[in-house]
């Protein structure tokens, strides 16, 4: 078993910290300073965003918007465009699934990347 205290784990704004990777998925902890954004983008995998602290405004390409604090969870289907904006200093967990180890063969399963 491995565990993390996501509210206290070291992560700098705009510098994602990969917590682990396996074929079942990838876990990434991110931090955004108040006013910072991740502009409209997409990923091949299903993306699950879980707000750990702060407040995020998360918007889908169709204009649907969710604003929420700690405990808010938003799910995007594969290739669904979305954007994230920090209304205040925020950290959030991003889960990507499934994660193809074949396509990302240089990664060691469930080992942090340096």
What is the predicted role of each segment?
Residues 52-53, 69-70, 88:
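A cytosolic small-molecule/anion-sensing beta-strand core signal
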Residues 12-13, 26-43:
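Conserved short histidine dyad/triad with adjacent acidic residue
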Residues 27-28, 36-38, 54-59, 73-74:
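Short beta-strand segments in beta-sandwich/barrel cores
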Residues 45-61:
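Glycine- and acidic-residue-biased ligand/ion/polar-headgroup-sensing regions
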Residues 62-79:
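Short acidic-glycine-tyrosine-enriched beta hairpin
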Residues 1-28, 59, 69-70, 108-114:
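A short, N-terminal "cap"/entry segment at the start of jelly-roll beta-barrel domains
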Residues 38-40, 58-59, 76, 81-87:
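Short beta-strand His + acidic residue motifs that chelate non-heme Fe in jelly-roll/DSBH
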Residues 75, 88-104:
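A short hydrophobic beta-strand segment most commonly corresponding to one strand
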